[in-house]
Amino acid sequence: MQDVKKRVEKLHDLLNQYSYEYYVQDNPSVPDSEYDKLLHELIEIEEKYPEFKSTDSPTVRVGGEAQSSFEKVNHDTPMLSLGNAFNEEDLRKFDQRIRDSIGKVEYMCELKIDGLAVSLKYENGRFVQGLTRGDGTTGEDITENLRTIHAIPLKIKEPLNFEVRGEAYMPRRSFIHLNNEKEQNGEQPFANPRNAAAGSLRQLDSKLAAKRKLSVFLYSVNDLTEFNATTQSEALEELDQLGFKTNQERERVSDIEGVLNYIEKWTSKRGSLSYDIDGIVIKVNDLSQQEEMGYTQKSPRWAIAYKFPAEEVITKLLDIELSIGRTGVVTPTAILEPVKVAGTTVSRASLHNEDLIHERDIRIGDSVVIKKAGDIIPEVVKSILDRRPNESEIYHMPTHCPSCGHELVRIEGEVALRCINPKCQAQLIEGLIHFVSRQAMNIDGLGTKIIHQLYENQLIKDVADIFYLKEEDLLPLERMGKKKVDNLLLAIEKSKEQSLEHLLFGLGIRHLGVKASQVLAERYETMDQLFKVTESELIEIQDIGDKLAQSVVTYLENSDIRSLIEKLSNKNVNMSYKGIKTTEIEGHPDFSGKTIVLTGKLEQMTRNEASEWLKMQGAKVTSSVTKSTDIVIAGADAGSKLAKAEKYGTEIWTEAAFIEKQNGI
């Protein structure tokens, strides 16, 4: 057991270090696959030895059991909002008021992150509770969801007791990925990253929150008793040293002119950031001066938030263009008369779905208001009705697919229209583009334009055809010289060696992402083994939900898919997992790797002693009987678990049979 404990401690240290490098320093020293491998190893050990699982284990990052509601908790100190400034005049008045009160002053300027304010409590250096701002006096306990954010340390270097506050946010890249996924699934996308972050942190199921890839910037310490800082800048530096993520774009300035210069700089540069900001926060830097100035009932007197003006422009909606994704979702896009918004020229904007078009009564030919939602995606806010042409008509989505002509359907519970024709050209092309992408088969040089040419020239119809391409097929294509063709054929040949998880992701199975592809590949090791899997078996696996289990089984049972896999195999495309399996604790073959449930009263030992002994033999001891349970050991007065085992046909041992097995070792 001492060896297991040491390994758990080592895994904690490694995973925390790698997480800090990736999510806080943005400078990873190992690939994602190495982190995932170690995390899977720790998950397996904790399942066999739950006594070694702690609240600060890196495994809590993946989420836990769903909650029924969030508990309301009073803040130890109210989370006040900041007063607002909207222009230079407001800022100069603020500065004058400060100087009239305390004389000479130095300011700390910080980016105002557009997210959800949170408060994190640490006791003896461990993260124990996280709350939303709520009404400022009472917030909601979202601790389990906050534990899934890798930028929040679960344990810090020093055994300190304090509360740190900050802003949880969704990076732009995560937001775009999430909305693409929602649209592919026919769901209503989020309007902006702030809404997405807030919605993610209010998920009752922390496993869903974990998938949303949130981050956090910390900006203040509520109780500095155990800190040495005398200024805001020093407090942030101490947080840096403790392993917290603070925003590094902050700047200390000596007067209001420095504040105005900082605002001017970030007004023009904010589009270059990987996250949204909606303004600048200006604070008196000296903490003793902050204390001297104090607070009003609503906000601190020593700080103010400058809000960026919302940039909206008017342009003309020329047309509505439809695109079909690889899952058949039909997405309308506004084609606009080009116009500058927030420093960039905009000629297209997403309209998401027909419901949104009707809700906002947007029509072709309208003069429309455009804004850049969260600095990312241009959004059509509304039509200007008094400029509407007399001949305008209410827009209706087509009843048939614009690519293949198949009838469009709206699946119950979805807002999107979907083409369900498996032979739809637009879907097939999008599927081919997905198959060759970096996270799938990673075929360098096989871009969108070449795929379109190959498809239009009937050289490829499915993903397997890629591996049947020859030099004479490629040379006649536009901009394809001999050297380029040779490199492409080499890349195609190299891709055949990709591990099974890349192939699974590349096939485009609905709901199957990168992470779940890795889980399935590692667990089942070969495509042949996956063909045998059942829906009930998949549901038992962590990270695999009901929808995904059904989707995978339905996909793999399809005879056309079986033929496609065979076609790939005939060209020696790898069908096996090539990664390193997570380590297993060796034990007796009668028990090692088996899922065992103990029920009823044992006479020769306690159930806890039996459980510990089984784990030492490599068994996984669980509390509930499922179809994947291998053995149920039943003592006296065994109840519903025994009945369930009989129903499933699970192997049942009496205590005597169990003792006999023990004695035989």
From Swiss-Prot:
NAD(+) binds at residues 32-36, 81-82, 110, 133, 167, 283, 307. One of its GO terms (molecular function) is DNA binding. Its EC number is 6.5.1.2. GO terms for cellular component: cytosol. Zn(2+) binds at residues 401, 404, 419, 424. Keywords: DNA damage, DNA repair, DNA replication, Ligase, Magnesium, Manganese, Metal-binding, NAD, Zinc. GO terms for biological process: DNA repair; DNA replication. The active site is at 112 (n6-amp-lysine intermediate). PROSITE patterns: BRCT (PS50172), DNA_LIGASE_N1 (PS01055), DNA_LIGASE_N2 (PS01056). Pfam families: BRCT, DNA_ligase_aden, DNA_ligase_OB, DNA_ligase_ZBD, HHH_2, HHH_5, Nlig-Ia. InterPro entries: BRCT_dom (IPR001357), BRCT_dom_sf (IPR036420), DisA/LigA_HHH (IPR041663), DNA_ligase (IPR001679), DNA_ligase_AS (IPR018239), DNA_ligase_CS (IPR033136), DNAligase_adenylation (IPR013839), DNAligase_N (IPR013840). Its cofactor is Mg(2+); Mn(2+). DNA ligase that catalyzes the formation of phosphodiester linkages between 5'-phosphoryl and 3'-hydroxyl groups in double-stranded DNA using NAD as a coenzyme and as the energy source for the reaction. It is essential for DNA replication and repair of damaged DNA. Belongs to the NAD-dependent DNA ligase family. LigA subfamily. PANTHER family: CHROMOSOME TRANSMISSION FIDELITY FACTOR 18 (PTHR23389), DNA LIGASE (PTHR23389:SF9). This is DNA ligase. It comes from Staphylococcus epidermidis (strain ATCC 12228 / FDA PCI 1200).
